[in-house]
Amino acid sequence: MTRRQIREEIFKLLFERELIDNDIQKRIKEVIEEEKIKKEDQIEFFEEYINGIIENEDILIQRIKDTLDGWTYERLGTLEKVLLKFSFYEIIIKKVGYEIAINEAIEIAKKYSYN
């Protein structure tokens, strides 16, 4: 699996979490098995990102709220909330270049957005 494919799986799991209160650790294991994520570095990336976003969720949401102009966080759609949390996590916590984080978010949005 490529990093982009793993990011998509992270996005889908976080999207699911926004809609359904479920056992996230159980779902992480299921997704790893279902998606055949085999390589240890891929599994580590997948788990680290999901757990990191969840652990830092309050910080990420506050940073998003501080950035929004003319909008409230509550008005954002589920897709937008997940992609923003994901992107903010990559930029702020993981120190991924903003160009990469934004490009990855755009590519996921193109694939999963209805517009």
Q: At which residue positions do the language-model features occur?
A:
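N-terminal interaction/assembly modules
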Residues: M1-N115
